[in-house]
């Protein structure tokens, strides 16, 4: 075979491969469109009657909001991973849907193309908004957004053990719901503002990093998120807090306890508990897993399942048999307890009483 023929065959093969790939990509896009068309068909009449038949439907979104805080929502097709790649250069129009009419949302409630409510109150709960995305080519896609009230979080506890990740520091996350439109975040420890000096403290987005951890880093950490709004002279401020407890390096050894036999009766339920007792009662870092005779992990399934509990340095995984049959007799199940440092296994066998 000459070089010329080999080159010709190569390009023919490449062309066929590209053709097949293009055909496959078209099939995928058609399936995505069909999926959202079916979703449109399942909408209640109070929603579907407002949709433009010339536009594709891009889904619905139910977003959570906290009273007295900013609320933000993207148009569903812009956020959906199946559709977002289709729309790169577009404008978004927002409308509020009422019983017998729809009203355009004012500019003060739109920020960077997203629905934006600076101070969310109960009157906004369960309101419906229709968004229409229109590209420069004239293609359009619509989505529907609803919002529901979420109870504001309390102070979240966090425990850090010295020696675990000292190289990377302790990271504290400011758990605000809508962070994409904030202006800046300031952090406080025990009511005193933290100086972000990139030595002891550094800040990356919504995270505060505490370098060279020590016991004295324990305390209450508050993050204050500042938002800008054209209607309000002063910033809107939202806060979250963490209670950090730094503990000395612990002994991560543990004892695994399991009866070597499960005494059962045919036709009745049975259970057995595998227990891990940590040397240090300050931490619960042991994970227990059950394996069936074939070596597969047992989860929360029918017939035979496992339930995990943990408290005060003691971790338990109970293996339940809903209805013992003869096929279980003689089976051996493995309990595996492990943490980052150690791993232990014990077995138990099903026997008739």
UniProtKB/Swiss-Prot annotation:
Residues 248-347 form the Ig-like V-type domain. Glycans are attached at residues 119, 184, 263, 271, 323. Keywords: Disulfide bond, Early protein, Glycoprotein, Host-virus interaction, Immunoglobulin domain, Inhibition of host innate immune response by virus, Inhibition of host interferon signaling pathway by virus, Interferon antiviral system evasion, Repeat, Secreted, Signal, Viral immunoevasion. The keyword DNA damage does not apply. Disulfide bonds join 75-131, 174-223, 274-335. Residues 1-21 form the signal peptide. Residues 67-139, 157-239 form the Ig-like C2-type domain. It holds the Pfam family ig. Gene3D superfamilies: Immunoglobulins. GO terms for biological process: symbiont-mediated suppression of host innate immune response; symbiont-mediated suppression of host type I interferon-mediated signaling pathway. SUPFAM superfamilies: Immunoglobulin. Induction: Expressed in the early phase of the viral replicative cycle. SMART domains: IG. GO terms for cellular component: extracellular region. It is found in: Secreted. It comes from the Viruses. Counteracts the antiviral effects of host IFN-alpha/beta and key IFN-inducible proteins involved in viral RNA degradation suxh as host OAS1. Acts as a soluble IFN-alpha receptor and thus inhibits the interaction between host IFN-alpha and its receptor. Belongs to the interleukin-1 receptor family. Interacts with host IFNA1. This is Soluble interferon alpha/beta receptor OPG204. It comes from Vaccinia virus (strain Copenhagen) (VACV). The lineage of its organism: Viruses, Varidnaviria, Bamfordvirae, Nucleocytoviricota, Pokkesviricetes.
């Amino acid at each position: 075979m000459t070089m010329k023929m080999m080159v010709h065959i190569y390009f023919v093969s490449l062309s066929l491969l590209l053709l097949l790939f293009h055909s496959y990509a078209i099939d995928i896009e058609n399936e995505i469109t069909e999926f959202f068309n079916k979703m449109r068909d399942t909408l209640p009449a109070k929603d579907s009657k407002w949709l433009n038949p010339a536009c594709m439907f891009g889904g619905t979104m139910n977003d959570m909001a906290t009273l007295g805080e900013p609320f933000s929502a993207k148009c569903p097709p812009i956020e959906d991973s199946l559709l977002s790649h289709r729309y790169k250069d577009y404008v978004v129009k927002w409308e509020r849907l009422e019983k017998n009419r729809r009203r355009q949302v004012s500019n003060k409630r739109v920020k960077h193309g997203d629905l934006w409510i600076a101070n969310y109150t109960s009157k906004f709960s369960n309101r419906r908004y229709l968004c229409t995305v229109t590209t420069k080519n004239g293609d359009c896609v619509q989505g529907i957004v609803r919002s529901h009230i979420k109870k504001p979080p309390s102070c979240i506890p966090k425990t850090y053990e010295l020696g675990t990740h000292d190289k990377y520091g302790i990271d504290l996350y400011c758990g605000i719901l809508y962070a994409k439109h904030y202006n800046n975040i300031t952090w406080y420890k025990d009511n005193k503002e933290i100086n972000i000096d990139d030595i002891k403290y550094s800040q990356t987005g919504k995270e505060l990093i505490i370098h060279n951890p020590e016991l004295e880093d324990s305390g209450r950490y508050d993050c204050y998120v500042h938002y800008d709004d054209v209607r309000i002279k002063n910033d809107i401020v939202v806060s979250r807090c963490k209670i950090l407890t730094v503990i000395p390096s612990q002994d991560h050894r543990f004892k695994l306890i399991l009866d070597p036999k499960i005494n059962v009766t045919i036709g009745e339920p049975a259970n057995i508990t595998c227990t891990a007792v940590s040397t240090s009662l300050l931490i619960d870092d042991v994970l227990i897993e059950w394996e069936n005779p074939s070596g597969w992990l047992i989860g929360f399934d029918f017939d035979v399942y496992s339930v995990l509990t943990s408290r005060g340095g003691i971790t338990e995984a109970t293996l339940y048999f809903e209805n013992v049959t003869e096929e279980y007799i003689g089976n051996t199940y493995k309990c595996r307890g492990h943490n980052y440092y150690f791993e232990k296994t014990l077995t138990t066998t099903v026997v008739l009483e």
